[in-house]
Each structure stands twice: as structure tokens, then as C-alpha cells.
Amino acid sequence: MNEVLALNGEIAKGLILALGNGRRQVAKTVCNAILDLSISQAGREQLCKALSVERLLSLFYQEVQVNRVLAVHQGMRKEAVECSKGRPMNESFVALILAAAVTLINSSTEDFLDRIPSELVKRCLPLLQEIWKKSRCPLLHGNGQRCWHIMKNGLPTTIFKLSMNQNLATWNYDKIRVTMFGDAGSEFVTFVSKYWEKSPVLLSEAIKNLEKENGVFRCLINSFNHQSTNDILDSVLMKLVSCQPLASDELDINCFLNENSSLGSPLIYGLDIRVVKAQQVSSESFKKKEVHFFDSSSGTLFSEGDYATKCKKAFQDGFTIALRGMEFRFAEIASITRGLADLFGQPSVGANLYITPPGSQGLTFHYDDHCVFVWQLFGQKYWFVSSSPTSILPRLYEPISSLPSIENEKEGGLQMFLNEGDILYIPRGCPHEAHTKNDAYKPQQELCSGLSLHLTLSMEVEPPFAWEGFAHVALHCWHEMQKEASDCIPSMEARRRKVFSVFLLHVAIKLIADDVSIFRKACLIAAKFVEHHADTLRLNQKANFLKIINIIDFSSNFMETFEKTVVQEANDNFLEWMRWLRHLPQRGDEDVKIDFDDPSRMRSELIELSIKGNEEMKDEFFQTKSRFCRSLVYEEACRMFQVMLEKYRRTRNQYMNGMLALHT
């Protein structure tokens, strides 16, 4: 019966008209009817077409003005108590409105949400955020009433979805460049050509304008209350929620939302926060190990307020507090990471915060698989950066086993104290450690002067945005341009051989990149350089790419590639690295497309094709490789790369906007 009613659009329109009746009892009945109709997808679609979300949000705004949020919260607490005593609870009008709105918004498409008037969203969002924060009261846990359950569990998703396409403030990339590297455009050029992904450098001279008016830095430090140690810890730790990670190759924010039903949940240890210190293994050894204050293997969920008290105790005991994903929690940090990502032509930049007490070390001697800019915000910290990086640039999440021992690496490295405002650049693969000065003689109330608070801005070079990734984009772009010629080939088998020769060349590029560092370097084609330096640097980027093409031309090995794909690596995971290529456009019939979404199926079909004639496959591979290396169009590849970059940025910004709204 519900399905039949749901398909009748006039019923939905009639319900929405009745919401404007002006009588509360009628409106309550309508909200209950909307909830019943929303059980089916057809009902939700008809209600959305009837502009029910706009009407519900308008009614919600009228009912709950800013100065009445507290009263709403008090009513919720009262009803929660009544429920806990086993008495029947009359669900409030606000709860009914919210439950209906939440149900419809959370099941709506992005296109539909974009049609909700932006001014209405701006008016309602602060109220929704305030009610959600207050609804996290422990008294409401276990409340069984339908509307409260829908509202409490669905409201974080509603806030996320209404916020994800909002335009938030971002520091212009040029302002970030001047703040971090200096006024002259040549200073950023010098950094890129001399230090980027090569060697560490202290950028203190660029930030000496602390004595002047540095808007970026001042805005950053003013986001923390730094009157005392407790104030700093409170400003950092309170009111945080978990930021479940977004898959690096996920470009549909709705997939993330559908797979994560725990938006707004408490912090998770190891994912959002770590509380750690480095301790010597023994008095005879310089070697240290990391000790966690909490159980590092349990994935503990921290309840509101409880974890902050425990973290303060850990801090007094010498533990460093490390918070991940600060760009999702503080708008000031988000605006900096967006500007920095734009400057370097990357989809996003991460930000972690480290608070270390006096005389302590948080992390042991280690290297990162990403480049970092260490920005000292408060206090001082001593850094040692080794002069012996790893033999090859590490890829993200691919550990390199050979880490130099700290005993052998103390000579010849970079050693310095970072003062407030200083920025230290550390390339990926460069081992380092840091500790604070010992101020144990100072009384507890003065420990703020000895603590260190620094922000690390993480430049993670993801596979699509390294030179290896650009080579894959260039090959894909070239293959798309060849499809008209393939249409003239009458034989299905011959057309498939051409497709699989391109597929194997993608694998060959990956195998070459495993051993050749230039393929692992960040592709800076989309980076923002000062105008009078831009042409020279663009030529340098093109020269890098031509080197890569020459390496592909001379180093591609059919037998090695074929054996790795078909014989030696018979497991399904070997080809998973190429799944990000599914985001690139493909045209034509299915027989001229590569199934990047299911590379194991491609492998199975390749085996069948090779049984019929491996020599033909080998000849086709070398012909494809030669034609690609000699006839690719660099400018077309740049355009496709830029389009892909913007797709990644859009999803990352949606995620960032949504998470920031849950921390506002």
C-alpha cells in the first residue's frame, strides 16, 4: 500500500501544502505521514520533487531561532528522562520536523541538494550544528523513540551533506608562497629546483616577517588559545569527532557516505590521535622505542571529555599528543592546506599537530613516505635530519626496509632549533627525529613556556600525481586518440590485441617506476609559478617528461611485463594499483576499452589471447610502445591530467567541508 501511495505525486504535493496550514497538530500529523511515505525510495523521490526539504527546513528555521536552541535542548533532556523512567514520550514538533528533513536529505542526490536555496542552508546549518552538539548528551543514549533516533544518528550526515558544496575561505596560493618562501618569485623557484624531494632546508628567513604583519601565521596561531598549557590542550582536544579516511581514489563522495554510518563518532585511537613518547631501550644503547599511553592495538573510541582528561595526564607524564587530520577540524588550517595544494598542483595537503612537553621526544628516528613542512607554532623544538636519505623515493604506504641506524647517522646531518614561525622542509625518505628542551626545574604552571606545538603540512604524492601517474595519463590519452584508426580494423581479435598491448604498456611503466626514481617524483605540471618564471619551469617539466618517455622507450621489456602479469604474479592483487585509471574517460565500444575497474578480468582475457599467439602479442606491444613514444601529444596529456586533478580536488574539498562542519 505504501508503494502505491508513494507513486502518486499528488499525495506528496498535498502533504507539503498541508505543512503550511499554520496549525501545529496538523503539521505534526503531516510530518508523521512524510516519515511513513519516506520508507520507500519512490516515496522519497516524490517528496523531494514536491520541494518537501525546502518546506521542512523553512518550518524548522521558523520554529527554532538561535536564541531558542538551549530551550530545545532542555526539552530533549526532559523527554529523555521521561523515556528513561518508562513513561510515554510525546515527540516534540522540532524532532518530527528534523526527522523528516534528515530522512529526505540523507537519501537525496547531490544534484537535488544543490537546488536547495543556499541562503536557507546558511540559516539552518548553525542551528543544526548546535542541536547536534547538544544532542550528544549521555542522557539521550539508548533513547528508543523513532524521531529522536533518526535525528541523533542521521543529523551528522545531514550536516555533512548540506555543507560539502559550500564555498569556504581559502588562502590564495600566492599568499601561501610569500609566507612560506618569501616575496620574490625566484625563492620558490629555487626551492623547487634545489631542495624539493632532494634535501632538507630551514625556511626561517622566509618567515622572519613575524615582526611584520603576517596574516597567514597570525591567523593560524590565533586559532589556538595559548594562555596556558591547559588552554592549549583544551583548544586542541575538545569537541573533536573521528575523521574516517576517504579512499585515495574515491571520487564519489556519496560512496563514502554510504559506506560510513558512523559520522560524528568519537575519536579513534591510532586513526585520529596518538599519545606516544620515545624511550631508550636500555642505558647501554642509543636505540629508542615508541611507547603508547593508550593500548595502540585496540582502536579505542574515546568518549566526550574523557579522553581530554587522560591526554592531559599523559602530557604531564612526558607523552606527545599527535592529532591527525587537522585540516578537517580547524578552518584556519584547512584554508592553508588548500592554498598549499594549489601552489604545488596537488589534489590536497594533510595536516597533523604535535604537542610535546618539555624534555620529551614523541616519535623515534624515522622517515616519512611523504614530504613535510614542519611549522613551529609555539615554543622550541630541536631537530636532527639525516644527510643519508633512502636509496629511492618511497611511495605512499610502500615501506623501504633499509633505514640507516641512528648511531651511524649523527654525523653530518642537519641539526637546529626551530623557533616560533620557523618552517623546516623534510623530503620523503629522509630520516629525522625531534625533541624539546628539558625545563623540569620550572613549576607546572609555567610549563607552557617549555612545550612545543608544531604543525606538519604533508605533501603526499599519490600515484596519479607522480611522474609515473602522468605517464599513465599520457598513454591513456594517446590510446583514446588512436581509437578512430582501430575502428577500421575488421577483426575483433586484432582490435583486442591492440587494447592489450596498451594494457601491458601500463604494466611496463609501473615496473620501470619500481626501480627508477624520476618516475616517483611529484609531477608539478599544475603547480602555480610566478609569471616571469613560469615558462622556464614549464619547459623543465616537459624536459622531465621527455626523459621519462625515453626511459619507457628503451626499458620496456615485453617478456618481463608479460611474465609479471600472467605467470609470476597470478594473484588478483598485483594489478590493483591501476584501478585509479578508471577515472579517466574512455569512449568507443567495449572491445576497445580497458577494464581498469576489474584488472583481474583483463589478465584472464590476456591469457586466453596469448594462447592463440604470443608472438603476435609481442609484436603488437613493441609497435604500440614505439608509436606512443613518438606520436604522443604532451599538451593533450596535460589537459587530461588537469581535468583529473580537478575531479580529485572536488571530492577532497567536499569531504573537508563536511568534516569541518562537524567541528564548527
Annotate each predicted stretch with a short phrase.
Residues 192-194, 235-422, 430-495, 659, ...:
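Active-site region of the double-stranded beta-helix
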Residues 85-329, 336:
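A generic N-terminal leader/anchor concept
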Residues 6, 47, 194, 211-213, ...:
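Residue-level detector of secondary-structure boundary/capping sites
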Residues 1, 7-181, 195-199, 402-417, ...:
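Fe(II)/2-oxoglutarate
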